[in-house]
Structure formats: C-alpha cells, structure tokens
C-alpha cells in the first residue's frame, strides 16, 4: 500500500537498525535536531523548550550554503520556532506552548493515561483537523519543491507530518483496508500476570 515510500527507500538510504531517541515527542525531535542525547540537552518533556543557544543541523547547513526550510510539526516549545531554519512554510499545529502536556507530579490523581485510553476508545473512521493539517503540509512542501529557486542553491526541506497521532481517527478509505476483517487481535488470558509489577501498574493507569 506504500509504493511511493517503497520507491524512495529503494532509491535512497534505508536505516534498518535505527531507533527512536526518546518515546516523547518534543524531546525526540530536539534530540534529532541537535544530534545530542536527551540527557545532554535536558528537554525532558513536551513542555520544556530547547535552548536557542543549542546549535542544530539546520545551523550547520546554513553555514554550508544551504537554504533550510521547515514545513509542519516540529514541536518547538517557546518563542524560538525556527532553531536555525531560515524559512517556515507552515506553523506548528500545537502552537509555541504545550504546558498542559507536562506531568503534574504534585497531584497523584491526575492521570494523562486516561487521555490516551480515550484516544483508543474514540478511534475509527472520520476526518480530523490533524489530517487536514497534514494535507496542507504536503501541499506547501510540493509547492516549495516547484519553486524556480530550487535550482539556484543547495537546499534542505523538512516536511513533518503529525499523523498517526491521538485521536486515532483515519479517513474511511484507509480504515476499510484493515478493519474489521484484517485486525483480529484476540485477548491473551493470563498475560497481565506474566508482566513485571511496574508494567502491571502501567496497565492500571490505562484503565484509570
């Protein structure tokens, strides 16, 4: 179902043994931009900004004579929404602040896991603003590639999409490819009891 992606992989370089640098969005993207571990740049969660004094690969490409352009989500927190990029074709879907996604450790009864559980309960076919946002990312990125200036100097474009993402809503044509005929996931009796106690507690959070 992914002929374009398959073609890009066949004609380019495929990293078959690569791993995400953080399970959380903003820290992962900050690590990607700086080439540093999350522990080095201290972007611990989705509410912590990346310091503007941190050099990114966009800065390095600028010095090498590239035009650097960002289109779409990069989850930059705070007033610096560029971090080295010279152009931005579309602002972030979240806006510059995301403090609501920071864990509140003082209130034990406040759980973000409930939000995640609800996303699965609400999953299904439909149209959501994130899909519309991604459509605009694609449109503006293609428009950028067609600009005459692309042949005048080296360039680097980051086209960054948000989906798949909670809420797990997908357009009908894609939903029908898998559900209900091709998504049989029966329960496994006794599976929870085989898990480490910490993982069992995580299961309790998702049932909150």
PLM regions and their residue ranges:
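Formylglycine-dependent sulfatase
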Residues: 1-208
